[in-house]
UniProtKB/Swiss-Prot annotation:
GO BP annotation list: Actinobacterium-type cell wall biogenesis; fatty acid biosynthetic process
Alphabetical list of InterPro entries matching this protein: AMP-bd_C, AMP-bd_C_sf, AMP-dep_synth/lig_dom, ANL_N_sf, FAAL/FAAC, FAAL_FadD21
Pfam family of the protein (one): AMP-dom_DIP2-like
Protein name per Swiss-Prot or TrEMBL: Putative fatty-acid--CoA ligase FadD21
Presence of keyword Glycosyltransferase: no
Organism annotation: Mycobacterium tuberculosis (strain ATCC 25618 / H37Rv)
Length: 578
């Protein structure tokens, strides 16, 4: 085990600063005002060892331990305890009672865990799910809160830990979930990379009294690293709550950010939009966001207009543009790949839409261009833009696949040697001078370099080909969202042997009567059709207006476009206009 592993640093912090606050969890499900519980470093370490002792009774080194627990301090103990026991932790969400959670079932089948860790509150739902006829034998269930977590912790250490600390199962927006094997070395390397960029003006170190604020789910890579791993690696206090707590009242997030000490957080694009729409002046009266060090914006496409609205909304509360840090990353690279330098505010550059659809990037005036955010020039990890067919680097201004190389890149996918070779074993042909040797990670994301800055246009597998031209669904969706405000899926479907554009749009109707509602739908249809034609030169074959929650998504909120196509083909969407 590396001296800088999560486990060794946890042990060190428990010894050097035993009574300092480590993790604070605010439970808003039991009380609307919130019930707060805090663990010190020594308490976290003790719980980790107690859980590890119990896990070790059912596991040998390298066995998988799946965590199916609600957000909370018990989840943290389960995750750390699994690794301390020499098992490979597998963080997941809790399956719903009476429902078939395909993702959880797929992961259980792939990981073949020897033990399940949960809590007494959801043990029934977990047991119901894992004991179904088609589910493989997955070992016993441990209820974390039923253990004596305040007693003496047993003294033991596993000498030879597995190479993988945990399996981060991908969202599966384009395929079945695959377990990315993340090592302690990956975690330490990626933490150093992101800290060097986010805090480059502070020599890669945040102020010692920094509080990391997060409501992101622990089973998602950004929530796991931000909420559990980064506080241990950096020695920072973490203030946590659940995704539901944020969705119910986004102002809770803002109050945690304004706790008086320097704070750091992260959120996907929709969270910034929701905070703008659902936060009233009364919710945040007297709030001061001046101590916010930064908020990472990632996990999904970052919309420039959303960030502008967020900054404008909270500017009276001392929030500044340079506090938002649009970032690019993926689970296969542990989490982080690129963002602009510390102190830089988000930069939006406009490019000719027609050129983008042919694979070129030409800057233009804002009135006629497609807005894209800059992610700076990545230095660590190393990034190249590559033609995915020839494996030759693309010149600046040419769209290609983003390839990544660095100690943060994972070893591969669990039990998937063919996919591992394809995704993690890419080799450059005729690499440019100064390019490191060895294999590269194919991200599946398309981007380009322009004036020494990287821009991202979308996923290769999501690209729409309509009338023989390439279009990026995120661009079309962004155009529509400026009108509707809700989730949008742009898909292409075959009609009479030709691919046609279909947009699925989630709407919450505001009309008081059926007649007013239909009039509202007609106005939206006309506005959306005109905007897509004007901005992208496309005709829409069908506008599918549906209630909120209709568009299938991954656990991290990414649109499952292939599933959208299938639902559309089978006429499974419930249309608001009949």
């Amino acid at each position: 085990m590396s001296d800088s592993s999560v486990l060794s640093l946890l042990r060190e912090r428990a010894g050097l600063q035993p009574d300092d606050a480590a993790f604070t969890y605010i439970d808003y499900e039991q009380d609307w005002a919130g019930i707060t519980e805090t663990l010190t470093w020594s308490e976290v370490f003790r719980r980790t060892r107690i859980v590890a002792h119990e896990v070790r009774r059912h596991c040998t080194t390298g066995d998988r331990a799946v965590i199916l627990a609600p957000q909370g301090l018990a989840y943290i103990a389960a995750f750390l305890g699994s690794m301390q026991a020499g098992a490979i932790a597998v963080p997941l969400s809790v399956p719903q009672i009476g429902s078939h959670d395909e993702r959880v079932s797929a992961v259980l089948a792939d990981a073949s865990p020897s033990v399940i860790l949960t809590t007494s509150a959801v043990a029934e739902a977990v047991a119901e799910h894992i004991h179904r006829p088609n589910t493989n034998n997955v070992g016993p269930i441990i209820e974390i809160d039923s253990l004596d977590l305040t007693g003496n912790s047993p003294s033991f250490r596993v000498k030879d830990l597995p190479s993988a600390a945990y399996l981060q199962y991908t969202s599966g927006s384009t395929r079945a979930p695959a377990g990315v094997m993340i090592s302690h070395r990956n975690l330490q390397a990626n933490f150093q990379q992101l800290m060097s960029n986010y805090f480059g003006d502070r020599n890669g170190v945040a102020p010692p009294d920094t509080t990391i604020v997060s409501w992101l789910p622990f089973y998602h890579d950004m929530g796991l690293v931000l909420g559990i791993i980064a506080p241990i690696l950096g020695g920072y206090r973490s203030e946590l709550t659940s995704p539901l707590a944020f969705l119910q009242r986004p102002a809770r997030w803002l109050h945690s950010l304004a706790n008086g000490s320097p704070s750091w957080s992260a959120a996907p694009n929709f969270a910034f939009e929701l905070a703008v729409r659902k936060t009233t002046d009364a919710d945040i009266e007297g709030l001061d966001l001046g101590n916010v060090l930064g908020i990472t914006s990632g996990a999904e496409r970052v919309h420039p207009n959303t960030l502008s609205r967020f900054c404008n909304r909270f500017a009276p509360y001392n929030f500044r543009e340079d506090m938002i840090r649009p970032s690019y990353g993926l689970a296969e690279a542990t989490l982080y790949v690129a963002s602009r330098n510390s102190g830089d505010k988000p930069e939006v550059v406009y490019f000719e839409p027609d050129k983008l659809s042919t694979g070129s990037a030409n800057r233009c005036e804002p009135k006629t261009g497609t807005p894209l955010l800059s992610y700076g020039m990545p230095t660590s990890p190393t990034v190249r833009i590559v033609d995915p067919d020839t494996c030759i680097e693309c010149p600046a201004g040419t769209i290609g696949e983003i390839w990544v190389k660095g100690d943060n890149v994972a070893e591969g996918y669990w039990n998937k040697p063919d996919e591992t070779r394809h995704t993690f074993g890419a080799m450059l042909v005729h690499p440019s001078a100064g390019t490191p040797d060895g294999s590269w990670l194919r991200t599946g994301d398309l981007g380009f370099l322009s004036e020494d800055e990287m821009f991202i246009v979308g996923r290769m597998k999501d690209m729409l080909i309509v009338y023989g031209r390439n279009h990026y669904p995120e661009d079309i969706e962004s155009t529509v969202q400026e009108i509707t405000g809700g989730r949008v899926a742009a898909i292409s479907v075959p009609v009479d042997h030709t691919e046609k554009l279909v947009t699925v749009i989630e709407l919450k109707l505001l009309g008081d009567s059926a007649g007013e509602a239909m009039d509202e739908l007609d106005v939206i249809k006309n506005n959306v059709t005109a905007a897509i034609s004007r901005s992208h030169g496309l005709n829409v074959a069908d506008l599918v207006l549906v209630p909120p929650g209709s568009i299938p998504t991954t656990t991290s909120g990414k649109i499952r476009r292939a599933a959208c196509v299938e639902q559309y083909r089978l006429q499974q969407f419930t249309r608001l206009d009949g």
